[in-house]
Curated annotation (Swiss-Prot):
CDD domains (alphabetical): Bbox1_ZBBX
Zinc finger boundaries on the chain: B box-type: 129-175
Residue numbers spanned by region Disordered: 197-220, 341-366, 626-668
Pfam families tied to this protein: ANCHR-like_BBOX
Skewed-composition ranges (Low complexity): 641-668
The protein's name: Zinc finger B-box domain-containing protein 1
């Protein structure tokens, strides 16, 4: 590598590394070629320039346009010269020839001396400036005066030169304003002299005129003059005046004496005592004028004491202060505090103004007095008779809260309302995030019957006896996860009377009517999209559980009443209800999923019958409160067993039923639809069946619906309650033919408070009907029942 190909770029700071920059060989070659090309162009231009110069020189030499000795010709007419010189051409020898050009001497015009002198004088003299000249540049007029230094400057010099460094804090004022102040004072003094001495000799008047002329000259001219000029003017004036003023002409001048005399003159003139010592006043005035001129030459600023002068038509300053101080004092004190004398020029006007202000103060004093008296008046006490409050707050004991401290957010319990004629059960399901607290929903007083205003205390307590029976009967560990909705305990219930004797009579009557009661074939509610109602499976003998189930179904029942205020008005005077409210603690069990759904043995079916029997005996009208639940119940996704399905189909053709047969049939169809919906989701592979069996099962279902419709009309006469109390059941009995589609729609219709109303009620069935299910059930019936269930899904799926 060649060092010429690198360029060293040293850095200024030591310690930095030297950077080398490599130059490309091609770039160097290109630069070399470009430089050579530029050199060639420059050489060509030089050659052309030389050639043109030589040509011009040759042309100039070849032409005969040159001066020759002894010949005079016109310079302008070149053709004329050429024509005359053709014959007289002189041939020169080869070599260098020297030529000398002769020029005519032209006489220049002589400039006048006056103009020359004026030009010189204009150059030497400075331009005239009106006023005082700037002390720095001496070319511009002074506009500002430095208060600290006392010198005059133009605006440019003061900003650029003077106001720098240590002098930047110096202040300035306008030069014109100060001069006006000084001249105003002098004018007043001379006017005073003229007024005092109108009959003095003319010489003295001439002297005053001269002094006044000097005063009226601009300040700049006066300031430019030196002290010698002032002395000359005073000497001339002193010669014209009387010999008594010779001391001033000699040069003896006392500044302090002149200042004191001037102050005395001013004080006497202001007070009006200017008739005494006229000569002294004149002498002091003359001294003052001379002193003023001397002060101007020495750049001293005239200062006089501050004097506040007020016009005669207004109050004096002290009077205003006095009024401001005593404006709130009473009128009696004002007369005592009035001063005896005021200044003479303001005496009359001051009295008038004082009278006006006193009147104003009198009005202010009256206002203040009225206000004070109003404030000091005794306050009248108004004795307002208040009636006794109609509302009283009664504090309850803490025992109610202590009972439910152990309860969690979700606590299942049932509320049973019993009647002698009919038995219906209601189960309620509430969400965790209910707007009412649990304790407030249970322990709250309600006022019913506007005439009597009876308080109803709905306190749900645990009964040990019922809990034992319930634990034995419901060994299937069913967890309904229900909470009582506080809206149910609204104005629907009018009176509740508790009596143990009524309960005993009710139990005996229900046991006597045990043989005539018919069991409801289904207890399945249409649920919301989020939750599905299921049942736990149990493996207990049928014989041990039948008697307990019958007793439990008779004891735990209530009269279904819809929570609406309109229905409470219709049943207010006729019904007398009693509430037997019992709450059962939650019984949880591990989730089993679809573990037993696909087991269809006869033994398994026999073991699974008690769960269906329990559900039939504990059949109730269920109102599910679909709220914002965070957890689903443990039995939400449990499917129904085959025994339950077969029992629901076999019990469809039962004995004549009560008035609620229409609702029972509708609930049966709804339960079958919900079961088939779940089966259709979980087991879609078993939907391929014969068309003949499908048509057969459809015909059977239509016949059953017609029979139930006829039974619904006859059962209305046997039932004691009117159709007004159960608007849902009467409306459902009219639409049993369309039950497969209507129940699917009504399942998603929610009433107020987000409640889904689900129908399901009935009575206990005979023991023989339940036993016959286990004996007559075979594998063939199981297959037939499965076929029926799958066929039922077909029209429902088509309709959707």
């Amino acid at each position: 590598m060649n060092r010429k190909d690198f360029v060293v770029l040293p850095w200024g700071k030591p310690g930095n590394s030297v950077k080398l920059k490599y130059r490309n060989a091609q770039e160097l070659r290109m630069e070399k070629v470009q430089l050579e090309f530029e050199n060639q162009e420059m050489e060509k231009k030089l050659q052309e320039f030389r050639s043109t110069r030589n040509k011009e020189k040759e042309d100039r030499e070849s032409s005969e346009y040159y001066w020759k000795s002894g010949k005079v010709g016109k310079l302008v007419n070149q053709s004329y010269m050429m024509s005359q010189n053709k014959g007289n051409v002189v041939k020169f020898s080869a070599g260098k020839v020297k030529l000398k050009l002769l020029k005519e001497q032209i006489q220049e015009p002589v400039k006048p001396t006056v103009n020359y002198k004026m030009a010189n004088s204009s150059e030497c003299e400075k331009p005239k400036i009106n006023g005082k000249v700037c002390g720095q540049c001496e070319n511009k007029a002074a506009l500002l005066v430095c208060l600290e230094c006392g010198e005059d400057y133009c605006s440019g010099c003061f900003a650029k030169v003077h106001q720098k460094g240590a002098l930047k804090l110096h202040r300035t004022t306008l030069l014109q304003a100060k001069s006006q102040i000084l001249f105003n004072v002098l004018d007043v003094a001379h006017q005073f002299i003229k007024d005092v001495n109108p009959d003095e000799p003319k010489e003295e008047n001439n002297s005053t005129k001269e002094t006044s002329k000097i005063q009226h000259k601009p300040k700049s001219v006066l300031l430019q003059r030196s002290s010698s000029e002032v002395e000359i003017t005073t000497m001339k004036r002193a010669q014209r005046t009387k010999p008594r003023k010779s001391l001033l002409c000699e040069g003896s001048f006392d500044e302090e004496a002149s200042a004191q005399s001037f102050q005395e003159v001013l004080s006497q003139w202001r007070t009006g005592n200017h008739d005494d010592n006229k000569k002294q006043n004149l002498h002091a005035a003359v001294k003052d004028s001379l002193e003023e001129c001397e002060v101007q030459t020495n750049l001293k600023i005239w200062r006089e004491p501050l004097n506040i002068e007020l016009k005669e038509d207004i109050l004096s300053y002290m009077e205003k202060l006095w009024l401001k101080k005593h404006r709130r004092t009473p009128q009696e004190q004002l007369f005592k505090m009035l001063p005896d004398t005021f200044p003479h020029p303001h005496e009359t006007t001051g009295d008038a103004q004082c009278s006006q202000n006193e009147n104003d103060e009198d009005s202010d004093g009256e206002e203040t007095k009225v206000q004070h008296t109003a404030l000091l008046l005794p306050v009248e006490t108004l004795n307002i008779e208040r009636p006794e409050p109609s509302l009283k707050i009664v504090e309850l004991d803490d025992t109610y809260e202590e009972e439910f401290e152990e309860a969690e957010n979700i606590v299942p319990y049932k509320v049973k309302l019993a009647d002698a004629d009919s038995q219906r059960s209601c189960a309620f399901h509430d969400c965790q995030k209910n707007s009412f607290p649990y304790e407030n929903g249970i322990h709250q007083h309600h006022v019913f019957d506007k005439g009597k205003r009876d308080f109803l205390n709905l306190c749900l307590r645990n009964s040990s006896t019922y809990y034992k029976d319930n634990s034995k009967a419901e060994t299937s560990n069913t967890d309904f996860d229900n909470i009582v909705d506080p809206d149910v305990y609204s104005s629907d219930i009018e009176k509740i009377e508790e009596s143990t004797s009524f309960e005993r009579n009710l139990k005996e009557k229900n046991i006597g009517l045990e043989s005539n009661q018919k069991s409801d074939d289904s207890c399945v509610s249409l649920e919301s999209k989020d939750t599905l109602l299921g049942r736990d499976l149990e493996k207990a003998p049928i014989e041990e559980k039948l008697s307990q189930d019958i007793k439990e179904s008779l004891e735990l029942s209530n009269l279904y009443k819809r929570p609406s205020f309109e229905e409470s008005k219709t049943t207010k005077s006729s019904l007398l209800l009693q509430e037997i409210a019992c709450r059962s603690k939650p019984i949880t069990k591990q989730y089993q999923g679809l573990e037993r759904f696909f087991i269809f043995d006869t033994n398994e079916r026999l073991n699974l019958l008690p769960s269906h029997r329990l559900e039939c005996n504990n059949s109730s009208t269920r109102i599910t409160l679909a709220g914002q639940k965070s957890q689903r119940p443990s039995t939400a996704n449990f499917p129904l067993s085959n025994s339950v399905k077969e029992s629901s189909s076999c019990l469809s053709s039962s004995h004549p039923r009560s008035r609620s047969a229409a609702a029972q049939s509708s609930s049966r169809a709804a339960s079958e639809i919900s079961e088939i919906e779940y089966i259709d989701i979980t087991d879609q592979n078993e939907l391929s069946l014969d068309d003949t069996t499908d048509q057969h099962t459809l015909d059977n279902l239509e016949k059953e619906l017609q029979v139930l419709r006829s039974l619904a009309d006859t059962s209305e006469k046997l039932y004691s309650l009117t159709s007004e109390e159960f608007p849902d059941f009467s409306s459902q009995s009219l639409n049993i033919s369309q039950i497969s589609t209507d129940f699917l729609k009504t399942s998603h219709v929610r009433g107020p408070c987000g409640v889904e109303e689900l129908s399901c009620s009935g009575r206990d069935t005979k023991i023989q009907s339940l036993l016959s299910l286990s004996e007559s059930s075979t594998d063939e019936e199981e297959e037939d029942f499965l076929n029926k269930q799958h066929v039922i899904t077909l029209p429902w799926s088509k309709s959707t």
